[in-house]
Amino acid sequence: MSTTVYLQKDREKSLLRRHPWIFSKAIDKVKGKPEAGEPVDIVDQRGKWLARGAWSPDSQIRLRVWTFKQDEQIDTEFFVRRLQQAQAGRELLISRLQLSAYRLVAAESDLLPGITIDRYNDHLVCQLLSSGAEYHRHELISALQQLYPTCSIYERSDVAVRKKEGLAERTGLIYGEVPPDEVIIEENNGIKISVDIKGGHKTGFYLDQRDNRAIAGRYAKDRRVLNCFCYTGGFGVYALQGGAKEVINVDVSESALELAKHNATLNKLDLTKARFEKQDVFKLLREYRERGEKFDMIVLDPPKFAENKAQLIGACRGYKDINLLAFQLLNPEGILLTFSCSGLMTSELFQKIVADAALDAGREAQILERMTQAADHPIATPYPEGYYLKGLVVRAI
């Protein structure tokens, strides 16, 4: 017998607008004893059917909606349909940019809550981030094997958010051959990037910054470029290819810097124009300021400063500080590419922080372009939380 979850009075409005989350406080009563991740029927206070979703007893997000169709069951064929729909939405992008790596599934924005899948050549890398995704693991994997029989499937569910769902972290091979230590992908019509699927950040690489790396390349010609929080050097590769006279890549990770150097070599770029600094970015930028160093272009792509609302005020201070330092280091007519990857940081707030940083640095500044996540990271219209990556191209006059 299926479980039915009744909502509090007037708490169905978000579902009527097709938002995929229901929080614990919106629930009136539960008829049945669902397992973690089990699909349940969601009804309003009068019993009118609204949606079918996954039960997450350990999360504040108590329900994640799978479907708004009452006759649609959550089985292997359901996942086949969702995956086919996701793949179809990316075909034009793959063809236009000659991609060998892309995000196949962007969780809620692809109507598959808690599931992220990236494809690197013939390797599918999955993150199962919710109780519902875990509960339907077998059906999801069966659907992937049916649609992508020649691809290996590797799991990278080693993320802290699983703890909020009462799930342990997990990584390892699910199907096929273990990915090699180095997987070389191509993007934007020929740029090569070395990816560490088993040990790299996220699923191995930041595919969401693909378009913005290309933008960086377009501004780099004849500029001295400082690439902060460089990770494996993607922005630096594009800057060198775009004609930068010097690129300084900065990260705290020695292994990331080695991979950044390798990525420059893969693309046959002139390493005499590149430096790789193992440093704390905040500390190094202050040292540069004291020494009077100047740059023509700075890229700020920091890690997420705010994981929850309680951390947002501190995150604002961090973004303000790092952007202030950047403005102080830029030559006249310098270009700043600055990003926030926190979903809690609105575009308006981020722009205000950058504006305040320019003001405190005594610089006139203009926004030339706004940047966001690449098109294989879509944002479902009822789900604004899917919009997480914000970026600005700023001219410091």
From Swiss-Prot:
Annotated Pfam families: Methyltrans_SAM (PF10672), PUA_3 (PF17785)
Gene3D superfamilies: PUA domain, RNA methyltransferase domain (HRMD) like, Vaccinia Virus protein VP39
Described function: Specifically methylates the cytosine at position 1962 (m5C1962) of 23S rRNA.
Gene this chain is encoded by: rlmI
MF GO annotations: RNA binding; rRNA (cytosine) methyltransferase activity
Enzyme Commission number(s): 2.1.1.191
UniProt keyword list: Cytoplasm, Methyltransferase, RNA-binding, rRNA processing, S-adenosyl-L-methionine, Transferase
The protein's name in its UniProt record: Ribosomal RNA large subunit methyltransferase I
Homology family: Belongs to the methyltransferase superfamily. RlmI family.
Ranges of residues in domain PUA: 2-81
